């Protein structure tokens, strides 16, 4: 009988943990200020870390979520290769490359936002060509 109580407590704790993992990220609106800033940071980091000469620009935001009790954002972004080079002055309105140079990527980012310090960190990023 005495072994049943710890077993029951263990099952309750495990069940609660599994339930909270599923609820860890909640949907947010795509125009939330800190989310928008995190998206811009993720795209800039992608361009900085990408070995290609051309920059990419945001085409579409898919998933927009925030981790409960934090400022960690989870986002799905579709980006397209532009005609602009990394060192061009105004890369925000660059047209997309067409034809043989056309390329799109789908990325999932987790960004930790500390906007009150103007500090953002990409925690994870995974990108695949589409």
UniProtKB/Swiss-Prot annotation:
SUPFAM superfamilies: Cystatin/monellin
Function of the molecule: May play a specialized role in spermatogenesis.
Pfam family, one: Cystatin
Positions of the Cystatin domain: 37-116
UniProt key word Iron: no
Residues making up the signal peptide according to the UniProt record: 1-23
GO molecular function annotations of the record: cysteine-type endopeptidase inhibitor activity
Cellular compartments per GO CC: extracellular region
Stated name of the protein: Cystatin domain-containing protein 1
Species name: Rattus norvegicus
Family named by the database record: Belongs to the cystatin family.
Annotated compartments: Secreted
Keyword Secreted part of the UniProt annotation: yes
Keywords carried by this UniProt record: Disulfide bond, Protease inhibitor, Secreted, Signal, Thiol protease inhibitor
